[in-house]
Amino acid sequence: MQLPSSLVSVAESAVQNAQEAGYLQSWPNEVVEQFHYVSALSQFITETIHRDEALAQQLPTMLSELSRHQAYRTRLAALLAECPDEMSGHRVLRQFRNREMVYIAWKDFLHAWTLEESLRHLSQLAEAMIFETYQWQYKICCAEWGTPTNAEGEAQPMLIIGMGKLGGGELNFSSDIDLIFTYPENGETQGARRSIANAQFFTRLGQRIIKALDQQTFDGFCYRVDMRLRPFGESGPLVMSYAALEDYYQEQGRDWERYAMIKARVMGCEMYPQYQELRKMLRPFVFRRYIDFSAIQSLRRMKSMISSEVRRRGLTNNIKLGAGGIREIEFIAQVFQLIRGGREPSLRNRGLLETLSGIEELALLTPQEVSNLEAAYKYLRQLENLLQAMADKQTQTLPDCDIERLKLATAMQLESWDLLIEQTQQHMNKVHQVFETLIGDDEEDEGSTIARHFHELWDMANKQDVLELILEQDIQVEEPAIFSKAIINFKADLAKKTLGPRGREVLNRLMPKVFDAVFAHPDAQFGLPRVLHLLHNICTRTTYLELLDEHPAALVQLVRLCTASPMISEQLSRYPILLDELIDPQQLYNPIPLDSYRTELRDFLARIPEDDMEQQMEALRQFKQICILRIAAADIAGVLPVMKVSDHLTYLAEAIVEAVVSQAWLQVSEKYGEPTHVKDREGKGFAVIGYGKVGGWELGYNSDLDIVFMHDCPVNVYTDGKKEIDGRQFYLRLAQRIIHIFSTRTASGILYEVDTRLRPSGASGLLVSPTDAFDDYQHQDAWTWEHQALVRARMIYGDEPLAIAFHNTRHDVLCKPRDEQTLKKEVVEMREKMRDHLGGKKSGRFMIKQDVGGITDIEFLAQYLVLNYSHEKPKLTRWCDNVRIYETLIAQGVMEEDQAMQLIRAYTAMRNEIHHRNLLNLDADVVEDKFVAEREWVKQAWNQWFA
C-alpha cells in the first residue's frame, strides 16, 4: 500500500483531520494504515467518514465483516421500522447507503476482493434499498388508502423490475438505477374509508419510492432513479398491470426494448409467487424460438447512435461508450443472446461473464476472443468502479487533472498514468476488433436497398396501386392509402408549376432522400404532408432544393422539425431563408445565450447600412425568426424546459425592443433633431415598460408585447434640428415610429403585435407618459386592475433616471395600504368579468388560461397577495413573474410552502402545455379531465384567500 510521494500530503491532511475529530485514536493500527492509503485516493471515503460520527466509530467492526451483503435487507428493514415519519426514513436510507458504500469503496481500493464480489455487493445493496423502501412505503400507503386487491379480494403487490446492470447483478459504483413498476391485476383498494383504483394506488406508491431514493436532501441521495425504460417512456404511465405490459411488448415492443429486457430482474423476486407469471410472460418477447439474425442490424443501429452521441458530446477517453469500451463488450454478448437465446438456455444469463462462458461453450467465438473480452471487461469495470469511487460521481471519462490521474493509476496498482493508458488501450483495441468482425458497419447493402424503395416510390408516384404495395410491403407503413394519396397529389400539383430542367433534376435526386428521411420517423403520417407542403412552396427556387439535396443533415432536421411542429413547418414554408439554419444541427439546437441576444442582434444588423430602413426592418424580422426556430428546435429536443423557453423568448424580445427604439430614434431625430435635455447626458430620456408576459419573463411563441412608453422631458424643451418641434411631441412621434416598425408587414411578416392599452387612461390617454404624470396617475386615478397589471410590469428598455423613477412609482404604489375586503371584492369582480368575456364556451373542454382553476386565477391570486401584503412586506414587490412571486410569498411567511409549491407546479404544467400546443398550432384548451388535480389546488387556494 505504497503511495507516490505526490499523494502523501493528501493522505497526511486527511489523517490529521481525523485525529482532530477524535475518531482515529480508537481504530486499530491496521485500519489507520489502510485509511492513510485510501484517504489519498478517495475524497468520498474521507468526507463521508468525517460527516458521520457513527460510521467513524463502527468502521473497524464493519471492515472485519466478510458477508455484510447477506444482512442488508434485515438491517435496513429494522431501521425503517423505527422511523416515525417520511423525513426520518429518508435520512436512514441515505446514511445506510453511504456507510455501506464506504465499506465497498474501502475494499475496492485495497483490492481486498474480486471484481465479482464488489459488483455483487453493489447490486445487492441497491436491491435491498429498493425492496425495503417499497415494503416500508407499501405499508404506509395501505394504511392511507387501503390494500390493493384483485376481483377475488386477494392483496396485490407491486413488482419492481431492475433493468440494465442492476438487473444483471453488475451495478457500478455511482450508477443510476433503471426501474419498471408493474402489478398483477387491476382492482381497487379495500380497508379504507374510500377505495381507489389499483392503478392510482400503485402510481402514488411508485412516486413515493422514487422520492425516497432520488430526492436530494441534506444527507444527499441514494440513487438517481431512471424510469424511461418503461413502456412509452416518459409519456407512459408510471405503473402498468401485467396485462397492459404484455399488450405493449407484444404489439409495440421495439428492438432496443428486447435488448434492455435481457437483464431484467424483479427486486426481491423470492417474495412473490406472481413473479413466475411475469417471467413467463416476458420471455417470448426477449428470446425468439427461431434464430433471429435481425438482432445484428438492430444493435448495429444502436451502436451507430451511440457513436454519434460520443462525437456530439466530445466524449474522449470514455471507457464505456468509446470504441472497444464496456458497451461494445455488452453488445457482443447480447447479439448472441438475442440471436440464439431462444434455443440455447446457456445464453439466457443476465450476467455478462456467465454469458461469455456460454458463448465459449457453444464455440460462437474462439477461446482467445472470449479470454480477451473477459479480461477487458474485468479491467474496464474495475477501472470504472475506482474512477467513480474517488468522488462518488457517475462518470466513465478518464480524468484530465494530473493529480486525479495519479490517484487512479495508484488505485489500479500501476506505476504511472502512461502505463494505465497503454493497458486500457490494449484491452479496448482487442474488444473493438471482435466487435467490428461481429457487428461492424454493413451499411452499403442496406442503404442501397432502402434507396431503391424510395426511388420506386417517386418514380411510380402516378400509380396508386404500385405505391400502396411499396408502402405496405417494403416500407411497412400502416394505412398506405393515406400516404399514397399525399404523394400522388403532390406530384400532380408539381406538374402545374414552372420548373426548369435543373430544378426537375434536383427534385428527382432529392425526393427519394426526402422519403427516406420521412419514413425513418415514427410519426411519418404528420411529417409527410408538412414536408410536401413546404417543398411545394419552394420548388421553383432551385437554390433551396439544392441546399437540401447537398446537405443530408439539413434534410434530416427539416423532417424532424416539420414532423414535430406544424408551427415550425409553416414558418419554414413561409420563410425558406430559414433553411440555411438547418445545415449545422449543433448550432440549430443551441439557442443564443441569454446575455448575448443584444450583441448578436447588433452584429446581425451591422452588415446593413443604418439609413436603409427597409432592409433594417427586414433584418429584424429575419433575426427574430432564426432565433425562434432555434428556441423551438431546442424546446422540441427537450434541451430547454418551459421556464427557459420563456426566458429566451423574453430576452429576444428585449433585444429587439432596444434595436427598434434605436432605429426609430435615428429616423425621427434625422428629421427633427434631438430634445435638448438629453444633450449633456447618456441615453435618450425614454423608456419602454413591459407588462404582462414580457414583464413577467413569460413570453410564449405567439405572445403579443404589452408595452407602455415613458419619457422624462420637461415642458418647454424643444428639439435642436432644422425642423424644431416640442420635446414631448418628439417622443410622441418616436413612439408612433416604434409601433410602425413593429407592425408593418414586410416580406418577412410583422415583428410583433404591440398593445399599448395599459398606459394611463388606456386608449384615450397619451401614447407616451411623462414620468411625473405616470406617477400621479398611478397614485390618484388608476383602478385596482391597473395596479394588478403593475405587479407584472418592469422596464425593458430605458435610461437609469427613468428606471429609478419607474421603480419608485411601482414600489410606492404596490406598498400602499389597502382595505382588504374592498381589494378582494374588486379583484374577484374583475376576474369574473374576464371569465365571462374570455372563458371557455366549448362543452367538455378546459380553457387553460381563462377557465376556473386556470392560469389567470393563479396570476390574479399572486397579484392580490402582493397588493394586500406589500405595505407590511415590501420585498414582495421585488419580482414580476409569478413563480418568483410565489417563492417570495413563502420566504416572507405569507403563504404556506406546500400551497405555494402546488400553485407553482400547476402554473408551470399549464404553461408547458400551452407552449407545446403553440408548437402544434392548437388552441389553449384541453379535454375536461386534464389538469384535474392542478385545478383543484388552484380552486382551494382561491376559495381560501378570497373567502
UniProtKB/Swiss-Prot annotation:
The keyword Cytoplasm does not apply. Residues 1-443 are annotated as: Adenylyl removase. Gene3D superfamilies: 1.20.120.1510, Beta Polymerase, domain 2, Glutamine synthase adenylyltransferase GlnE, Nucleotidyltransferases domain 2. It is an enzyme of class 2 (transferase). Its cofactor is Mg(2+). Disulfide bonds: none annotated. One of its GO terms (molecular function) is magnesium ion binding. Keywords: ATP-binding, Magnesium, Multifunctional enzyme, Nucleotide-binding, Nucleotidyltransferase, Transferase. Its EC number is 2.7.7.89, 2.7.7.42. It comes from the Bacteria. CDD domains: NT_GlnE_GlnD_like (cd05401). One of its GO terms (cellular component) is cytosol. It catalyses: [glutamine synthetase]-O(4)-(5'-adenylyl)-L-tyrosine + phosphate = [glutamine synthetase]-L-tyrosine + ADP; [glutamine synthetase]-L-tyrosine + ATP = [glutamine synthetase]-O(4)-(5'-adenylyl)-L-tyrosine + diphosphate. Residues 451-947 are annotated as: Adenylyl transferase. Pfam families: GlnD_UR_UTase, GlnE. Involved in the regulation of glutamine synthetase GlnA, a key enzyme in the process to assimilate ammonia. When cellular nitrogen levels are high, the C-terminal adenylyl transferase (AT) inactivates GlnA by covalent transfer of an adenylyl group from ATP to specific tyrosine residue of GlnA, thus reducing its activity. Conversely, when nitrogen levels are low, the N-terminal adenylyl removase (AR) activates GlnA by removing the adenylyl group by phosphorolysis, increasing its activity. NCBIfam families: PRK11072.1. Belongs to the GlnE family. This is Bifunctional glutamine synthetase adenylyltransferase/adenylyl-removing enzyme.
